[in-house]
């Protein structure tokens, strides 16, 4: 295996996990803060807010999992090596 391709794959896999976690991390923090604020304003709507929050957190977390899958593909099933 070419050492340059191997090194680039390791760097790219690290970047894919890191960059894929930044956006969802910020989004999850914002969503949780807004959910807590909404529950504080309308305690009777807590069930609907919590359900919507959990669904949206799952969608946001899937983006991070996609980044992990790309990183694992670059590390173990690298299409750029022969």
Curated annotation (Swiss-Prot):
InterPro entries: ATP_synth_csu_bac/chlpt, ATP_synth_F0_csu, ATP_synth_F0_csu_DDCD_BS, ATP_synth_F0_csu_sf, ATPase_proteolipid_c-like_dom, F/V-ATP_Csub_sf. The record marks 61 as: Reversibly protonated during proton transport. Its main location: plastid. The keyword Chloroplast applies. The keyword Ion transport applies. It comes from the Eukaryota. It is a multi-pass membrane protein. In plastids the F-type ATPase is also known as CF(1)CF(0). The chain crosses the membrane at residues 7-27, 57-77. Coiled coil: none annotated. Keywords: ATP synthesis, CF(0), Chloroplast, Hydrogen ion transport, Ion transport, Lipid-binding, Membrane, Plastid, Thylakoid, Transmembrane, Transmembrane helix, Transport. GO terms for molecular function: lipid binding; proton-transporting ATP synthase activity, rotational mechanism. CDD domains: ATP-synt_Fo_c_ATPH. It comes from Guillardia theta (Cryptophyte). It is found in: Plastid, Chloroplast thylakoid membrane. F-type ATPases have 2 components, F(1) - the catalytic core - and F(0) - the membrane proton channel. F(1) has five subunits: alpha(3), beta(3), gamma(1), delta(1), epsilon(1). F(0) has four main subunits: a(1), b(1), b'(1) and c(10-14). The alpha and beta chains form an alternating ring which encloses part of the gamma chain. F(1) is attached to F(0) by a central stalk formed by the gamma and epsilon chains, while a peripheral stalk is formed by the delta, b and b' chains. Belongs to the ATPase C chain family. This is ATP synthase subunit c, chloroplastic. Pfam families: ATP-synt_C (PF00137). F(1)F(0) ATP synthase produces ATP from ADP in the presence of a proton or sodium gradient. F-type ATPases consist of two structural domains, F(1) containing the extramembraneous catalytic core and F(0) containing the membrane proton channel, linked together by a central stalk and a peripheral stalk. During catalysis, ATP synthesis in the catalytic domain of F(1) is coupled via a rotary mechanism of the central stalk subunits to proton translocation. One of its GO terms (cellular component) is proton-transporting two-sector ATPase complex, proton-transporting domain.
